């Protein structure tokens, strides 16, 4: 018949056996990619420094998703938290990857079988002898099975009854580990940052899915509704399936970009809003005030700040700083973080403490301005030195370091002070190794940014796909001139094609 490339999928439009076959092959490809990608990431992943070189800095994409649902050990003898392991068991990172690859192979064989044996008695109506699918019943079966899976995940896997639990951490991403979670049945379960909501919502949604599946298995749709929504046409299934997928894609884009209990910052990196709102900076200041209240010295107080917390408070970990089309991991941008230099405290010659104004997310360059505690500009690095009033040299700015590698160091040389003032624009100051990976110094986004961009883009494309296929199935008689009640079955690939003279137009 000579179908153009953009219409080749119509060969399975009226062929249930081969429709199953291509779906099996698609699932085989997805599962095979997941397993292969996991093995590739495990081959290049360095688990030695979970604090300064975590998975999201290294550009891992599959490993964070495995980790958040309870996989934490490797056959290589390491645990994602930095400890060592002697008995990882079968459900290690490598075990899960291998399971996906084995599943992919079995699905591949099943796809071939269904392609060869496409004309099964299962697809024929006993009353008429013609091939037909009971789509409402199939919908009920799928709904029931997905409900069972959803319920089981929430009731057993997440709660630890039969499974490891999920990744749980504190609000600042410091103490994360895999542990069981109790369902949250109160109003707190609707807080996107409460892990208990993951368990309770899966249980509730699973029960709803099971009940809805049983309903659709036992109750037939009214004839008018059946005809109005073209429930006998498999393109209706395609349209509604695309709707479910694009809706889910939009939802997970939001939970990833804005943050949630399901997207921990230890696995996917911080969100941009945590930089914009000074989220980690405020927590650090709170800890400093508590330390000062105990009459500890600044050096002692800052030495107590976890390096992990300080590292979050650095603009290079902001997923919105990396351009969407800058390929590579964060480590390929500013480099591999080696150590925290400590907190830089600036003062002018009058002894006033000065604070460097931090760079906003969407700036590549930003003027170096130092303000006092009341927000009054006291020093800067001027663009035009001839007109400057507040230059570091004129104001006599010095910098002292507390905590970190430069603890106790003090600098008054203007060139050195300006160097650290520029770096303080970017948050806490860290030393980076840019030689190992030949890092180019240009910020990259984290997997949080890639995931959001990809899922938002595909959700938009799938939205148009839903409109397209929904319109095609609802207005088939208008677009193709084919009677919507036509149930004739002919050779697969030669039915209801636009411009195909062999297709019957009217029901006899």
UniProtKB/Swiss-Prot annotation:
It is found in: Plastid, Chloroplast thylakoid membrane. GO terms for cellular component: chloroplast thylakoid membrane; photosystem II. GO terms for biological process: photosynthetic electron transport in photosystem II. Signal peptide: none annotated. GO terms for molecular function: chlorophyll binding; electron transporter, transferring electrons within the cyclic electron transport pathway of photosynthesis activity. Binds multiple chlorophylls. PSII binds additional chlorophylls, carotenoids and specific lipids. It is a multi-pass membrane protein. InterPro entries: PS_antenna-like, PS_II_antenna-like_sf, PSII_PsbB. Its main location: plastid. Pfam families: PSII. The chain crosses the membrane at residues 21-36, 101-115, 140-156, 203-218, 237-252, 457-472. Keywords: Chlorophyll, Chloroplast, Chromophore, Membrane, Photosynthesis, Photosystem II, Plastid, Thylakoid, Transmembrane, Transmembrane helix. PSII is composed of 1 copy each of membrane proteins PsbA, PsbB, PsbC, PsbD, PsbE, PsbF, PsbH, PsbI, PsbJ, PsbK, PsbL, PsbM, PsbT, PsbX, PsbY, PsbZ, Psb30/Ycf12, at least 3 peripheral proteins of the oxygen-evolving complex and a large number of cofactors. It forms dimeric complexes. Belongs to the PsbB/PsbC family. PsbB subfamily. One of the components of the core complex of photosystem II (PSII). It binds chlorophyll and helps catalyze the primary light-induced photochemical processes of PSII. PSII is a light-driven water:plastoquinone oxidoreductase, using light energy to abstract electrons from H(2)O, generating O(2) and a proton gradient subsequently used for ATP formation. This is Photosystem II CP47 reaction center protein. It comes from Adiantum capillus-veneris.
């Amino acid at each position: 018949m000579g179908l153009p490339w953009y219409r080749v999928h119509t060969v399975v439009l009226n062929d249930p056996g081969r429709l199953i076959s291509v779906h099996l092959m698609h699932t085989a490809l997805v599962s095979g990619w997941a397993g292969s990608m996991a093995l590739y990431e495990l081959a290049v992943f360095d688990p030695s420094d979970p604090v300064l070189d975590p998975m999201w800095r290294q550009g891992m994409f599959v490993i964070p998703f495995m980790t958040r649902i309870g996989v934490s050990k490797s056959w290589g003898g390491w645990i994602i938290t930095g400890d060592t392991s002697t008995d990882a068991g079968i459900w290690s990172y490598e075990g899960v990857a291998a399971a996906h690859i084995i599943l992919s192979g079995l699905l591949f064989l099943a796809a071939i079988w269904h392609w060869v044996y496409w004309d099964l008695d299962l697809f024929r109506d006993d009353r008429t002898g013609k091939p037909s699918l009971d789509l409402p019943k199939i919908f009920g079966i799928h709904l029931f099975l997905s409900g069972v899976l959803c319920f089981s995940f929430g009731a057993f896997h997440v709660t630890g009854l039969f499974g490891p639990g999920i990744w749980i951490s504190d609000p600042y991403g410091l103490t994360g580990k895999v542990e069981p979670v109790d369902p949250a049945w109160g109003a707190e379960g609707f807080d996107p940052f409460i892990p208990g909501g993951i368990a309770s919502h899966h249980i509730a949604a699973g029960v709803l899915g099971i009940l809805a599946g049983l309903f659709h298995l036992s109750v037939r749709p009214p004839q008018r509704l059946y005809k109005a929504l073209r429930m006998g046409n498999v393109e209706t299934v395609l349209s509604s399936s695309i709707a479910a997928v694009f809706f889910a894609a939009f939802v997970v884009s939001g939970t990833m970009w804005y943050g949630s209990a399901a997207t921990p910052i230890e696995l996917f990196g911080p969100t941009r809003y945590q930089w914009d709102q000074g989220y980690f900076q405020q927590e650090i200041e709170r800890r400093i005030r508590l330390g000062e209240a105990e009459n500890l010295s600044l050096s002692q107080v800052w030495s107590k700040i976890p390096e992990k917390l300080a590292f979050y408070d650095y603009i290079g970990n902001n997923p919105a700083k990396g351009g969407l089309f800058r390929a590579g991991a964060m480590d390929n941008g500013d480099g591999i973080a080696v150590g925290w230099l400590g907190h830089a405290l600036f003062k002018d010659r009058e002894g006033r403490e000065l604070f460097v104004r931090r760079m906003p997310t969407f700036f590549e360059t930003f003027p170096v301005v130092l303000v006092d505690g009341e927000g009054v500009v006291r020093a800067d690095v001027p663009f035009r030195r001839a007109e400057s009033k507040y230059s570091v040299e004129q104001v006599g700015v010095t910098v002292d370091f507390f905590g970190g590698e430069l603890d106790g160091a003090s600098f008054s040389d203007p060139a050195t002070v300006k160097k650290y003032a520029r770096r303080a624009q970017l948050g806490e100051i860290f030393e980076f190794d840019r030689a190992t990976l030949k890092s180019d110094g240009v910020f990259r986004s984290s997997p949080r940014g890639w995931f959001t961009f990809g899922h938002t883009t595909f959700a938009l494309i799938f939205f148009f796909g839903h409109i397209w296929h929904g319109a095609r199935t609802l207005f088939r008689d208008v677009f193709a001139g084919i009677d919507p009640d036509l149930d004739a079955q002919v050779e697969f690939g030669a039915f209801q094609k636009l411009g195909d003279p062999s297709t019957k137009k009217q029901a006899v």
